[in-house]
Amino acid sequence: MEMKNVKGTKDYLPEEQVLRNKIKRACEDTFERYGCKSLETPTLNMYELMSYKYGGGDEILKEIYTLRDQGKRELALRYDLTIPFAKVVAMNPNIRLPFKRYEIGKVFRDGPIKQGRFREFIQCDVDIVGVESVMAEAELMSMAFELFRTLNLEVTIQYNNRKLLNGILESINIPTERTSDVILSLDKIEKIGIDGVRKDVLERGISEEMADTICNTVLSCLKLSIDDFKDAFNTPLVAEGVNELQQLQQYLIALGINENAIFNPFLARGLTMYTGTVYEIFLKDGSITSSIGSGGRYDNIIGAFRGDNMNYPTVGISFGLDVIYTALSQKETISSTADIFIIPIGTELQCLQIAQQLRSTTSLKVELELTGRKLKRALNYANKENIPYVLIIGEEELSTETAMLRNMKEGSEVKVPLSSLSNYL
């Protein structure tokens, strides 16, 4: 049998997991600093849930992994963490609002594969339910900037409002049933340009006259500020979208993050579930062209799941761990899983005890040479594993209750007392 992974999946070896775990911890620490609570949901879901009309829309339906259990039930692997979160809130009406949750977990999409994007990947999500104010969006955007500062990545956030976009399309008489098609085309404008948008809407069955109107409208809007849209498109939906964008902009200025937050009137976020603010996060240096995070407001899903069709104001943000890992691995040296490596020279029993003592009395990550390698080979292993310190303990060192501490980066050695070893690290 040929040993190979399923296309779009990957094994991450221990040296890769060091960096991936660092990203996870940075996410967890940042999310919890903002008062978010951890939640875990099943990977396996009912197909009816994952294909619900208020979820990802037709584009996502094509990418859902489906299966059937022995009871002939139609099931699906989750394609995001948002729909399972909405399900949890709908099933638990006693959850105290506002509820701020985070979840880090695997999701699956049978879609195209490219740099930093696979078919099995990890999302790191935060969602807030129970807050109508765009202050929630501002806090999530601020949290995103803080997370990427922690990871030493410079980012920009593009943002828009679906009410504004829908209002513009309404004002140029795009039929309601064609709005989703046009939005999906507009969402690609930065990748395919205005000519590409025209071609795309034509392929979706839009008439040439309507396609020309769409493209002319896009060109006329590109230089407009947020405030200008009220005068350019005098509709209630545009006015509502502009008001929310103006409020959001005020919060971004107050938080000192407006400079790296860019208004993009045709950012759409293709998913049909969004009802207000939408945003996407990009690396400033452009080393990865796809977004490394995204999200927005979706006020209708929970009410639809509960069957009461009430408005449950909800906004979320999602970070792609795999694409962040790809970005960091291009610029960061992989560190070690251990702080110190103990090499016994005829002192295995005592070194076993010393390693255990260090683990229980300090925060050091300690690895012990277990295979009986000679000193040179053991040092070579520590060097390849990027372990910063090595502790060499032989009979002579034991007799004086000392050890030889080697700094692997500098190549220097010093004899240190075992009783105060942590002071030298």
UniProtKB/Swiss-Prot annotation:
Annotated GO CC locations: cytoplasm
Subcellular localization(s) per the UniProt record: Cytoplasm
Record-level GO BP terms: histidyl-tRNA aminoacylation
Molecular-function annotations in GO: ATP binding; catalytic activity, acting on a protein; histidine-tRNA ligase activity; transferase activity
InterPro entries tied to this protein: aa-tRNA-synth_II (IPR006195), aa-tRNA-synth_II/BPL/LPL (IPR045864), Anticodon-bd (IPR004154), Anticodon-bd_dom_sf (IPR036621), His-tRNA-ligase (IPR015807), HisRS-like_core (IPR041715), HisRS/HisZ (IPR004516)
Enzyme Commission numbers on file: 6.1.1.21
Name this polypeptide is given: Histidine--tRNA ligase 1
Native source organism of the sequence: Bacillus cereus (strain ZK / E33L)
